């Protein structure tokens, strides 16, 4: 049987805490799945690994039979993988500008709009360096 996404023996730890411990699963193309579990079970961590915003400590992923190891959400998007957020969110590992570009790409606009968006951001009180990593911003920014 052919699978679109295969995950084998994924492990991700935060210090002594194992968020994912030897997780394996296979997903067929055009199928719908849900990750269910208690708070702290590692669901979000696994999704972030699939989406490329976190790297696993160990394990292997395959997309359409080929090794798959996205280094960013941009690479994941090239394979048609995107994330729909329950609550508004930014990718903490990306810069302000990269977050804007990712959003523009999603709605079919190009990077030329980035400068204009940053101009309006300043006008409305969001005056940040576009090259600053979002995870380094204060909560109010």
Regions found by a protein language model. Name each.
Residues 1-141:
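Glycine-rich phosphate-binding loops of nucleotide-dependent enzymes
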